[in-house]
């Protein structure tokens, strides 16, 4: 060892093992996802205590769930038939890093895009169905999301089916610029054609539903349901406060606030949504 060589200051230890009475013991690692912090009550919740519906046992906060989890909770087992899976996302503006971000998100989520579309039965009631997944780039609305939802309405018109959409989105996808914003008008036109055919359109607003999705098809349903405490809005709270220079109510942009002011028809617990949707579909000439 040289005179000026750096010496180790500390003893290296392995936190996953220890020796007691001359016997080497291994300490099991605690999985990173064993507990979840509830955004509602701020408590650490054992994941298994959340149950399939991902509801906090302390405050009943509904955790955000994936499209796959939503399907399992909502539709009849084995009834879902996915549609419009072959549409590929492109990069119309050559936005730097966009395709790489898409590839990484697809690998992480197992989804091709931010919305899953298809046909299913809910308690025996047949419907066209779309579920947005906030795990995919915050379920932002790009050209593929717009195309899939538009095609779903067109399919529903041909098959004379109602449409149920579970919305969740951070808004328009900025990487696609004006092409993303165009989807608002495109889907809205499809909603109108579906309505002209005398068919039911039901939306379920889930946390969060914001931006261009709120400003278009999320609020165009014949019946608008929402999960409790869902964040619903267009611009962000701070943007609005800075613009109007007023302090907004604590419950501003929450589902309960919107129901009180007539923008939401009913707030339904996640565990009761399937029954509620099926009942509404049956009232409006449901298809078996």
Swiss-Prot record:
GO molecular function: acetyl-CoA carboxylase activity; ATP binding; carboxyl- or carbamoyltransferase activity; zinc ion binding
Gene3D superfamilies: 2-enoyl-CoA Hydratase, Chain A, domain 1
UniProt xrefs under InterPro entries: AcCoA_carboxyl_beta, Acetyl_CoA_COase_Trfase_b_su, ClpP/crotonase-like_dom_sf, COA_CT_N, Znf-ACC
BP GO terms, sorted: fatty acid biosynthetic process; malonyl-CoA biosynthetic process
Any matching Pfam family: Carboxyl_trans
The entry's keywords: ATP-binding, Cytoplasm, Fatty acid biosynthesis, Fatty acid metabolism, Lipid biosynthesis, Lipid metabolism, Metal-binding, Nucleotide-binding, Transferase, Zinc, Zinc-finger
Pathway assigned in UniProt: Lipid metabolism; malonyl-CoA biosynthesis; malonyl-CoA from acetyl-CoA: step 1/1
C4-type zinc finger segments: 38-59
UniProt entry tagged with the keyword Zinc-finger: yes
Catalytic reactions on record: N(6)-carboxybiotinyl-L-lysyl-[protein] + acetyl-CoA = N(6)-biotinyl-L-lysyl-[protein] + malonyl-CoA
EC primary class: transferase
CoA carboxyltransferase N-terminal domain residues: 34-288
Record-stated family: Belongs to the AccD/PCCB family.
Subunit structure: Acetyl-CoA carboxylase is a heterohexamer composed of biotin carboxyl carrier protein (AccB), biotin carboxylase (AccC) and two subunits each of ACCase subunit alpha (AccA) and ACCase subunit beta (AccD).
Protein's name in the database: Acetyl-coenzyme A carboxylase carboxyl transferase subunit beta
Organism: Streptococcus thermophilus (strain ATCC BAA-250 / LMG 18311)
